[in-house]
């Protein structure tokens, strides 16, 4: 009985989610109960060692970065993090990265590339932070250099969209 009920639920969910219009799809991606990057980091990886700072200006808490073990193998983990409640969302800038976040990920991607460590990224952002301060600190250049770095990597990379996938 439980098995048939689960099958029925699965079929109904598949039917619902395969017929969403674009706005409904956006609302699902933005749903506050979706698991965030921290959830995946805590539940998929062992021995996560967080690394922070861009070595120029400061730390961007909208992106979690660090080395961890996945099935016993070393990986670099990058996760855009929106936060779970109002305070953590403000602290994490609602998942909108600043130049410091892009420079931090570039620094760590280059390190992973140097030591032949694969990269796993979790994407969940409405887009890059559009503030004046971010622009003054080189937001556009940081985004461009991040894209360039990704294109030049020699290590395997996996990018998993877990929510929004806005530009930046």
Predicted ranges, named:
Residues 1-168:
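Terminal-region recognition feature
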